[in-house]
Amino acid sequence: MSFRSPGAPTARMPRRSRLLAPVGAAVVVIIAGIMFAANFWTEYRWFGSVGYTTVFWTELRTRALLFAGGALLMALAVGLSVYFAYRTRPAYRPFSLEQQGLDRYRSSIDPHRKVFFWGLVGGLALLTGASATAEWQTFLQFANATKFGAQDAQFGLDISFYTFTYPFLQVIIGYLYTAVVIAFIAGVVVHYLYGGVRLQAQGQRVTPAARVHLSVLLGVFLLLRAADYWLEQYGLVFSNRGYTFGASYTDVNAVLYAKIILFFIALVCAVLFFANIYFKNARVPLVSLGLMVLSAILIGGVYPAIVQQVTVSPNEQRLERPYIQRNIEATRAAYGIDGAEVIDYDAQTELTTAELAAEAETIPSVRLVDPAVVSQTFQQLQQVRGFYQFPQVLEVDRYTTSDGETVDTIVAARELDGPPSQEDRWLTRHLVYTHGFGMVAAAGNQVDSEGRPVFLEYNIPPTGELSQVGEGYEPRIYFGREGAEYVIVNAEAEYDYPVDPDTPEVPTTEDAVVPTPSPSPEADEAPAPADSREEGSAQEQQDQEGQDGGEDAQGTEEEQSGQGSGQANNYYDGKGGVQLKSFFDKLMYALKYQEINILLNNAISNESQIIYVRDPAERVEKVAPFLTVDGKAYPAVVDGRIVWIVDAYTTSDRYPYSTPIDLAQATTDTFTESTTAVNALPGNRVNYIRNSVKATVDAYDGTVTLYGWDEEDPVLQTWSKAFPGVVTSKDEISDTLLSHLRYPDDLYKVQREILERYHITNADAFYGGQDFWTVPNDPKPQAGNNPEPPYRQTIRFPGDDTPTYSLTSTFVPRGRENLAAFMAVNSDASSEDYGQMRILELPRSTAVQGPGQIQNTFQSSAEVREVLLPLEQSSAQVTYGNLLTLPFAGGLLYVEPLYVQAGGSDASYPLLQQVLVGFGDQVAIGSNLQEALNNLFDGDEAPLEEPTTDGEAREEEEQPQASSDLAQALEDAAEAYEEGQAALREGDFAAYGEANERLKEALDRAKAASGSNEEKDE
């Protein structure tokens, strides 16, 4: 141990060391300030480039106002409390061990008390202000509230009070609570530190000034508690105590009265604390405070629990009936399903020839091409170069072809996947390879003779139906779902597209073999496609295309640099980016992206633009932060331009009596779990949702337009007041755009989950729960244990004269697998019946199989196994497509395409080879839908093919030499079987299919000849 000699100088820290901390802190602050400035400036420039500066400034002003309000509230509350406690400190403190110990702290704090004071007040103010800015949307909704025109069932208040006003009042009371509590704690600490409160004193323990100060703070706290009790009674409409969400019997008959009683008790306690300023006796208010706490436990907690246990539980159904009914009605209204029509549907399981003939006209519209399977086919046939890509799940839209027919269409945008790997560097990634090129579209109900999609729009430069709009068509895609990184345009020459690309020949409408032909003689007499006559087998084509595609995908350095095969370049002339007008702009973006090349690259001039926030959904979210955006934007050609269509929702979690739902859970299905192309909604709990906005994002210039779709929605009206001019009127939607708008997937998935229970509108039946449904798991073997996604298809609903473009789904009973119901919603936005939701409810005793059961029947059927077994034993990969369910001839028909992909080659892709169908308890398989249906209905082809005349029938009966015909037929069958097996071993699926057709035809002839022999013997 060492001692410092008296008078010896104190060791001092070197000057450099003493400056290190403040200099370091200053550097950190400066860097943070510069980064904040860069972010602020680039955000402002971006909003200016898209024309939504109103959103930027409104949000900024609101956040600044709330920051100032929250900071001022906390600063005043804590600052005044500390200041008053210090100024009223006693001049004389009685001597005690307690005060002796505190003297050391006082001597340390006093010289720096101003620093401590402003540090404490400033720090708390900053934290509170920053926290308050998060409530900017709550404040704007409160300030611009729009009435719903409907009242809650308990208090009779307009729904807007609960949706807009109630949440803001909760926020205000919460911040006042926090400020008073912290002010009280700070006051107690200062009073204790300076002797105003003495815990070990023999006489007076609290000085008069401290008593007044703390009594006022406790009185204010109790006034706030009283206000909170009063507000909590309205919050009972969000209670989850009862059988359903919302105020229950116990809430209305016990908790409500408890809140009112506690409100008055809190008021009395507050008055007693204020009176303590004059009466100078803290016992009475403190005792009253203890009694209030006890009352809150007994009246607010124990009493309702007794009522629930003793009164409600033994008589729950009778007592909860009116409250269950309130919940049913509110939930159906909040989710927009109150107009859903439930139709009793006793689905038949057998058909007559006449019934089948009546449905023949709907057969050609069945969408067999599965958008979740053919992505790889699009990739192989239409990728063109290896740096283009298609999403894993394509989209289903509708287009009117040049012959005037409107068809379900599988569409995808050919987006950029970054530069070739050997050229992947900063310049090529951000300045050269900047955009995708063109749309690709295929008919949803047609394939060619080998099972490939029939393309309506294809190739580079674009060819086909979608681009036939004259000179104005713009195929370039600068904004898309794969646009995660920024690009800088009008700098280097941009790669546009390959000149004279060596792309594989693709099937078009001239090559189509409709798998579901209409029952006309002309269709039966159609010649075989040129592909099948001239080009050889599908496998040979796949191998050749794979070689071409492999060369395209890998490419030579010469090709991908723009030499050799050549390339077209492009200079952007749109307004979709932020112009880099000055060195300052370049500096700000270099800081934002931490990329020095933005400053150093000489090609970047004052005319260059930086394009970022390129994902359509993200772009809409940014200009409309009050909206929840659907997980799947889809492309469409509208008036000669590719646009992305984005559905957006207004939501709330404050709709009285409506059951809340987790959006992420409700919108999760096979696609969201197995691919990155479809996203579930964010995991927010809401109990109100509307598809209030349809947004478009131009793929070339990034223009964002928000159309008010549900203009009667009070939530949208509220936001339109807060952000005037941001949402465009629905009347501005063009007819072309309207034809591509559709019922949104995520809204439908939310509604179908609610309808699992809320298709029941009677409280007693709802309480019983025997008729609850569930969405079945996707039955496909590759789907995993995920809910089946909804499917878009054109169907004819029972009782309708014409087919309707619909979004469909099925339900099974909870705990069972047979089919309970089929639901369809009109998805044609140009129709007056858009959004009409109809549900076919089957009897409990139905024999109709559910999706899981029919899939199991498909896979275990001897007829199906006979066809699939040779494929599965080979190297081929068999993929089950979307299992479609559709009303058909008084029953429900299941249709599932079957795809086959050759193994052993990266260049192979799925081909539609077979179609599975099921009706009632019968299943069948065929090379197309017509054949599958003929097999399903005992080979009765009369409704689907040209009928045979009576004369022809007599002629066939009179044909001689039945025995020789039988022998010849059997010989042909054996020959066809051998040829089919040989083709299968070689992987030639086209030849295999043809051999199977000859085998079937030979067996039919053999059966006919055998029947003729039997008649002769008789």
UniProtKB/Swiss-Prot annotation:
Organism: Thermobifida fusca (strain YX)
Keyword Transmembrane helix: yes
Location within or outside the cell: Cell membrane
Protein name per UniProt: UPF0182 protein Tfu_0541
GO cellular component: extracellular region; plasma membrane
Major location (coarse): membrane
Record membrane topology: Multi-pass membrane protein
Acidic residues bias spans: 542-560, 939-959
Segments of this protein annotated with the region Disordered: 497-570, 939-965
Annotated InterPro entries: UPF0182
Sequence intervals crossing the membrane: 20-40, 64-84, 115-135, 171-191, 212-232, 254-274, 287-307
UniProt KW keywords: Cell membrane, Membrane, Transmembrane, Transmembrane helix
Family: Belongs to the UPF0182 family.
